[in-house]
Amino acid sequence: MSPLFAAKAALRLGLGAINLALAVAFFAAVADAGEQYVDAEGRPVGGNDVVSYFTEPAPLPGSADFTATYNGVTWYFATAQNRDLFTADPQRYAPAYDGHCAYAVAREDKVRSDPLAYRVVDGVLYMNFSPRIQQRWERDIPGYLERSQANWPALEPEPAARPRGGWF
């Protein structure tokens, strides 16, 4: 076997191994993705237009005329433009922690959220259980976010919270 042939064979084998490793990592990440929190009607963020949380003073109701699928659920939008913004970069607009209560995640739990108890912090949408919990969370946003980020990797694979219930 010539040295050139051996080098090409080794390169092909190495590239094949890298491709296999990347594929395994990708599918493992997808398989471990958490379930999106949805309300009793199966809608994320209560059927509101998630882009409007970033662009309007208050969230706008979504419409069945403008929808997109992401993270296994149908998202509703007030306009085709907002739908298109979302589909171009859903991770930019989808709420943190798959729409679960940010305060609860900081306390190592997955709890439902209220679509009107929210805040955008540094370009990220955070939902909370209720306006009262939202106020508590806002007293120490940096501290709660630090704890949430540390807790989320263990919580994410768990099933989504039920639409009714919670521990508050």
Segments the model singles out, each with a brief description of its role:
Residues 27-71, 91-168:
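Intrinsically disordered, low-complexity terminal tails and linkers in eukaryotic proteins, enriched
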Residues 69-82:
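Beta-strand cores of secreted/periplasmic/IMS beta-sandwich domains, seen most often
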Residues 12-28:
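Bacterial N-terminal signal peptides
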Residues 3-5, 18, 167-168:
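Short, aromatic- and cysteine-enriched interfacial helices/patches
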Residues 82-84, 134:
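Primarily extracytoplasmic ectodomains and periplasmic/lumenal surface modules that are beta-strand-rich
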Residues 1-11:
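N-terminal secretory signal peptides that target proteins for export/translocation
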